């Protein structure tokens, strides 16, 4: 994948960039693997906003991605196409299995049209092949990792994501996540070899707010810019929060929301590294 910079023909174009989509081999998805996706606009069943800053955006169709692949052990497949998916940052690959079935998977770096893909413990260590962690050599970079055996891929699904298998000891394997976190998962969990494709996605400059609106993201307004009726930080002369600690629009203290003592905490060897400011 490459990135093409826009010419500064307008203020919105200046500084903006876009993917070249050079790896895409087909523009229309496989009809049998597409489902309708209804836009909720951040509303619940009563029509009230429960998730702010959502709404609008281009109409999308949902592509069914195979995150399990357990039922295709020993059945090889050929990569028919590399396609764009509007619902995720990664590209997707359409597989044609020898038994006649078609399925989508996340397209890793190096996977191209015509390649052979396998599933199961006996699969080779090649990008796109899915097998249990116990059958993958330590030091290998993987993606689409399960948290529970048979539960489907949960970790390492975004564009450019790569999880390194550091060690295997007993029933658990130690992984280093893209965030720097080190955690353990069962060696029976499956993972796909390689790094997720579309690596340059993180370097795209959106250029203007309108491109975020196309993605269905609405503006996020600061509390200090609101009136007192709208937010606890609102009102006052100038940018003042009234001396109180940051709170949500409903008065709840901002900050950590993760449950303390979550059962899976015991599997986290080292917390994620803090971002450099």
UniProtKB/Swiss-Prot annotation:
SMART domains: Ribosomal_L2, Ribosomal_L2_C. PROSITE patterns: RIBOSOMAL_L2 (PS00467). Residues 37-55 have a biased composition (Basic residues). GO terms for molecular function: rRNA binding; structural constituent of ribosome; transferase activity. One of its GO terms (cellular component) is large ribosomal subunit. InterPro entries: NA-bd_OB-fold (IPR012340), Rib_uL2_dom2 (IPR014722), Ribosomal_uL2 (IPR002171), Ribosomal_uL2_bac/org-type (IPR005880), Ribosomal_uL2_C (IPR022669), Ribosomal_uL2_CS (IPR022671), Ribosomal_uL2_dom3 (IPR014726), Ribosomal_uL2_RNA-bd_dom (IPR022666). One of its GO terms (biological process) is cytoplasmic translation. Residues 1-55, 217-277 are annotated as: Disordered. Signal peptide: none annotated. The keyword Ribonucleoprotein applies. The keyword Ribosomal protein applies. It holds the Pfam family Ribosomal_L2_C. Part of the 50S ribosomal subunit. Forms a bridge to the 30S subunit in the 70S ribosome. HAMAP family: Ribosomal_uL2_B (MF_01320_B). NCBIfam families: rplB_bact. Belongs to the universal ribosomal protein uL2 family. One of the primary rRNA binding proteins. Required for association of the 30S and 50S subunits to form the 70S ribosome, for tRNA binding and peptide bond formation. It has been suggested to have peptidyltransferase activity; this is somewhat controversial. Makes several contacts with the 16S rRNA in the 70S ribosome. This is Large ribosomal subunit protein uL2. It comes from Thermobifida fusca (strain YX).
């Amino acid at each position: 994948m490459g990135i093409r910079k826009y010419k500064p023909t307008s203020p919105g174009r200046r500084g903006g960039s876009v993917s070249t989509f050079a790896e895409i081999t087909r523009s229309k998805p496989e009809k049998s693997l597409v489902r309708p996706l209804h836009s909720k606009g951040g509303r619940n069943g009563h029509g009230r906003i429960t998730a702010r800053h959502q709404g609008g955006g281009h109409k999308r169709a949902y592509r069914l991605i195979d995150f399990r692949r357990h039922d295709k052990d020993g059945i090889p497949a050929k990569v028919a196409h590399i396609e764009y998916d509007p619902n995720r940052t990664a590209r997707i690959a359409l597989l044609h299995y020898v038994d006649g079935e078609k399925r989508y998977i996340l397209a890793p770096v190096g996977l191209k049209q015509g390649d052979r893909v396998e599933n199961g413990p006996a699969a080779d260590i090649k990008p796109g092949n899915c097998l249990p962690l116990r059958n993958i050599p330590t030091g290998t970079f993987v993606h689409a990792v399960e948290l529970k055996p048979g539960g489907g891929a949960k970790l390492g699904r975004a564009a450019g994501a790569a999880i390194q298998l550091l060690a295997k000891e007993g029933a658990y394997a130690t992984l280093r996540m893209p965030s720097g976190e080190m955690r353990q998962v069962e060696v029976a969990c499956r993972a796909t070899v390689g790094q997720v494709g579309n690596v340059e996605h993180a370097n795209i400059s959106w250029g203007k707010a309108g491109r975020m609106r196309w993605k269905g993201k609405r503006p996020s307004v600061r509390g200090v810019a609101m009136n007192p009726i709208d937010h606890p930080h609102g009102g006052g002369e100038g940018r003042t929060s009234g001396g109180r600690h940051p709170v949500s629009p409903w008065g709840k203290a901002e900050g950590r929301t993760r449950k303390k003592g979550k059962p899976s905490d015991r599997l986290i060897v080292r917390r994620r590294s803090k971002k450099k400011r």
